[in-house]
Each structure stands twice: as C-alpha cells, then as structure tokens.
Amino acid sequence: MVLEFTKYQGLGNDFILLDNRQQTTPLVTPEQAIQLCDRHFGIGADGVIFALPGQAGADYTMRIFNSDGSEPEMCGNGIRCLARFIDHLEGGNAPGKTYSIHTLAGMIRPRLETDALVRVDMGEPILTATDIPTTLKDSNGQAVNQPLEVAGKTWMVTCVSMGNPHCITFVEDVAAIALEVIGKDFEHHPAFPQRINTEFIEVVRPDYIKMRVWERGAGITLACGTGACASVVAGVLTGHCDRLCTVELPGGCLQIEWSAADNHIYMTGPAAISFQGQVTL
C-alpha cells in the first residue's frame, strides 16, 4: 500500500498526518505506526494523527497513535497540527475559522489565527483524583501538592487531567533534571493505573514558567500542549502561577490561559508543515 502523508510540527513535537476522511477506521495499525515513527528506518515522528469523519456532531474526528503504538486520548500540539492540516485539505480558510473535533478526551475546538498560530479551547481541567486517574488523593479528593516517592526521592506533585493524565512537579532548575533516567519511573509508577505524562516546572515568574516533559508512550519530547495546560492549572492551584502564563518548552513557547469566567483552558501556539511525501507499507 502506498500512503500519502504530510509531516507537521508544533514546537518540534512532530507528527505524521493522514487524510482518513474516507473511512472511520485508521489507515494504519499501531504496529505500522511504530514503523512510520521510527527516526532511523521510517519517516520519524512522535506520533501518527488521523483526520477521520466527524462523529457526535463534530466536523472531524481525531485519533492518534504514539511512537510506541499506544493511543492517547488527545494531544495538544497534535490538535493544532491537525487544524492546519484540515485547513490545507479544505483548500485554505481565512483566519478565525473554528473546527469542532471529536477526540477520546471530548470535543475540542481549535481556531486558526494569523502567523501560523492556532488557539484551542481545551475545555475544563479534571481535578478529581479518581477521574485522572491516580491513587494519590488529598482531603478534597484531588491530588494537589501530594508526596510521591520516585527514584529514592520524595517529590511534591499535583495531578491534572486534560482528557489525558498529567503529573506536575515544581523544581529549582529544570535543566538539571535527569529526565532520561527518571521519566519512565514516573510514567510507570503504581500510583498511576493508566500511566502518566510528567512535567517538571521551573517558575521564572508567575506569568512565565519553563517546562520539560516525559510523555506517556513517547518519552522525552520538545513540547506537550496538554502538559503545558495542566502545568498552569497546577501552578495556579499551588500558588506558583498566574492564570495567564507563558510556558517555555525546549521547542518554543505556548500561551496558556485558565479562564476564571468559564473554567476552560485556552492554548495558543504554532503549527507548521514540514514536508509531504509517500511511503510504501
């Protein structure tokens, strides 16, 4: 089978985008996605994203396979790339166009902005510990500033779901974290029955933070949109951050707002095409 694809990246978090509008099942299997994402023997990417027909009243449906073949509920950087890909498939739209996209995390609405930016209504954060899910829990039934033993050290963590689970911890120097060593220990900790994405945050000032991430199913990546959203929520809950905050990631910056008016998280960041091609499976 010859497969046409388009490669996109959002802050260096890169994806293979497939036009899957003609059928409701993904064009490739998780095993094939692993091959496509291989950076030595495949195209190379953090995941494969499928633009499927809409369901539940949505314009489109998004599914994604990670580079290890697992399927996350949603991906913040990925949905910005998908919005730009859909715009390309439809022949281009003026800035301000909004799409409704059905995901395993619910309905997400990205809006095209100028200068290749996309603003995404990410919905409300999930804070109830059992819904994230995590076995960590405070007296309010949330997991805010809770101790977690990892790699012989006690970390104070806050857990938030943006449709996918996140564990956030605040550190003095994010560059000093041996992410390649402890990332998997967090991901597979028994406190997280569905595994976890982990964000390490250095607060520069209340409206500016630095973040590094270990993504569930992908490992170290240059950016994570849902992680940036979850980190600002965690920062507000623990008194570290303002509700409007710039998040600096290795791949660039995202603007995150946790609106007090509607409790929704709004993420603004870039998405750009890298190249197009064909691959034989």
From Swiss-Prot:
UniProt-annotated catalytic positions: C75, C224
InterPro entries according to UniProt: DAP_epimerase_AS (IPR018510), DAP_epimerase_DapF (IPR001653)
Main location: cytoplasm
Annotated GO biological process: lysine biosynthetic process via diaminopimelate
PROSITE patterns attached to this UniProt entry: DAP_EPIMERASE
Pathway participation: Amino-acid biosynthesis; L-lysine biosynthesis via DAP pathway; DL-2,6-diaminopimelate from LL-2,6-diaminopimelate: step 1/1
GO function term, MF aspect, one: diaminopimelate epimerase activity
UniProt-listed Enzyme Commission number(s): 5.1.1.7
Protein name: Diaminopimelate epimerase
The organism of origin for this protein: Picosynechococcus sp. (strain ATCC 27264 / PCC 7002 / PR-6)
